């Protein structure tokens, strides 16, 4: 493949095959640096099969290089355990489809030549923006087509595979590409999705860059009568398990430690998270396959970062160990092209511990597992606009009912001193259930602002943050995945109404997220959540009537609300599919949750979210930039000093004559330290 292509060559190209090669040329020169392209070529050609001068990869070479297990999937019913995620055939199907871009209908499945692999890497690492001005950053329709394997014409797939095989070696290609036969990788025709016209932007932009729109339109008109495509649950599950396992993968990090020799517990945890995502689809979709409209809506709204792990996975092609200068300096010789280097996992790579974003602290999580954190990374926002792992976010343990007890005083002491966004995770089961793992329900909420008493609910921030990271999220992880994104209208106002705060906290009623708080209830609260104005300081009497307290408690509002009682023993998730876009949250996606879920809480945890240093350092009163952990420790030290000071003052009150006692008492009452006014003070610090 040449380094460049002349304009006359582009004008002379008229067939999809010629235009496909020219697009690969343009991708290679515009989307990779010269060094990356050199490494890419070395990786490809040092491993490629050669049949009469035709160089290509088969499934085994691709799986071995990416360290994606390609063995026989071990079913639990068969007994035994091979520690593998059998995703190799699925990845190969995807790559064979994407290699034909933008002529998937006439050229897919494609043989994995260097030109095809160039397009695959550009598409999966989202580097196409350097060439395709009109290209959209979501690849949902393209990825759906690469996975669709239900509802296709077997005759067409067989013909396409035979045509592809003839262009290479009939004997070798048929032997090595057994998984490709019967793959349904042509373009889906689920044209009832609302945004189907916009979803062709990538392909249109690609052909527009080559002045070949008419050829593309001709290709799109071929075979409009093909059956509606669907993704089988088995295919989707295997891909999900791979994505969950490699979600923490960093650029050029060894993949082996995430995909090989998983323990039975680790593989079961990965499978459980995959099953909760699959359970969010309808019974018909689970039985007959997932259609494009449902797939696109679910991925776009509730799993926007699902395919992010594919980026660092395929970026491995852009670095060759054969060209590692440090190895050359030590005198190590390069493997010869006739003997392709083996990508078998080494013991050192397998034994190396996977990356974790959970920091050590006052407790170890009784809820979160590495697979669950991977699940969270598929939809939780970050200020960078990327997922949790790619944003270098860390989770700091702040509060746990297991470690700190179920006291709201302890909750205030640990949570209200955390001056950064946080993640609330609740795990429990339905009342009367046995509490087995299959019956556990896991709920959570992303709180974008610190828990603190405040006289303002402003969304103004000194940093230019990504909008999604400034919105709250309510979600359920188990037994069915579902997400309620924050209402974007929250970003359009500086003051959030005091009757509908994001979070409301009271020692009387507990914790309420996304609820409506009656004005009468605000007069009786003792603590306040983020963005909730403090009431006027007026003396009041506590209500003793239980019924009266219930009437003044937070009420479910909008599309979703979470209410946790003051004893941290029970939780209620309220879902409304008729509320449209009113309230703090937008409707649940997928819409599979019951309207009311009542659970007995087993564990409740708060995890602080620490952004990269450039974003998480905020100045203190002296103008010194400090992270959230340091500021929390300083708050605890201040509280401890205040407690000692007050203790000393109380001792002095006991001595002296009555006049001195009354004067000291009056002084403390005016300061709000003791007396009725002290009872009304918000509990931001304890």
UniProtKB/Swiss-Prot annotation:
Residues 366-610 form the TLDc domain. Pfam families: TLD. SMART domains: TLDc. Keywords: Cytoplasm. It comes from the Eukaryota. Residues 188-198 have a biased composition (Acidic residues). GO terms for cellular component: cytoplasm. Residues 155-198, 326-355, 522-559 are annotated as: Disordered. It is found in: Cytoplasm. Residues 544-553 have a biased composition (Polar residues). InterPro entries: TLDc_dom. Residues 155-176 have a biased composition (Basic and acidic residues). May be involved in a process influencing telomere capping. Belongs to the RTC5 family. This is Restriction of telomere capping protein 5. It comes from Talaromyces stipitatus (strain ATCC 10500 / CBS 375.48 / QM 6759 / NRRL 1006) (Penicillium stipitatum).
